[in-house]
Amino acid sequence: MFIKYLIKPSFFILLVLYSAIGYAQEASTLVAGKAVLWERVDISSRDLFAGPGGTAMKPDLKSIEFIEEEKSGHNKKYRIEDASGRIWVAKLGSEAQPETAAVRLLWGLGYKTEINYLVPSLTIPGKGTFEKVRLEARPAGIKRLDEWKWRDNPFVGTNELQGLKIMMVFLTNWDLLDLQNKVLRVEGQNGPEDHYVISDLGATVGKLGNNNLPVIFRIGRKTGDPDAWTNARFVERVKNGELEFHFKGKGRDIMKGITVEQGRWLFEKLAQLSDAQVADAFRAANYSPADTDLLVAAFKRRVEELNKAVGPAATGKAKN
């Protein structure tokens, strides 16, 4: 009888130890990936209409199966399966178009991003028919890990991270919470890579708030508004070799300490995007021809504004 009672706790302890070892082994595997935020690419040859998924990943809409409703975020989202068996998260509402364009613009510069497409009209069985739906891929071979933090990550102080921060002001992203960031485990050619992406870029192509007061800083914010983005302020001034931006509300502290040299690094990338590529990014997001023209012009003005702030344009071939 004594042995019987002794075996039970011993078995429980062994089970706990085995589970702990298994978890530790899994954790050690997860931290092994090479951290990647940005990579050198041939910017001028990137297809911003197809985007990071290209034509190969385009969703097959011949049939759609509803899986479940996603509870995160402010916009309504549904997890669905397309005719080819691929899984997607369908986002509805005002963030769908700007997010589709923003992903393509960042990817065009070499930043790692989610894979998404804008569908003009989509019927989800049991839920209804919706206009301008963003579909974000959930590939089976990509593992979604934890969020990453703006103030604590492997790229602090680098041109890549500082350039990404500038792009957040450039795109008027007023939702710079760490929970919008995600690490994606991808199998690269030379082993596993951890791609640091901004998973939610919906609060872009509009206007930032107009003050820093608690709660009230939300006043004036806009999303997916071409007219607002055209008139939105960007660079405020250069002071002591650092760029100061028009960025109000939460997260404004992360915009401090960005140098002129880091701004020039980003400008050299932006200058390699053609008008046609930029237009493709907005066309892929289903903006009208008139709005696309407006947005391309606004994009060019912002690039020139950055150029003036960081000094004369780079001569010769821009460095990647």
Where are these regions (language model features)?
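Conserved ATP-binding subdomain of kinase catalytic cores across diverse folds
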Residues: 53-150
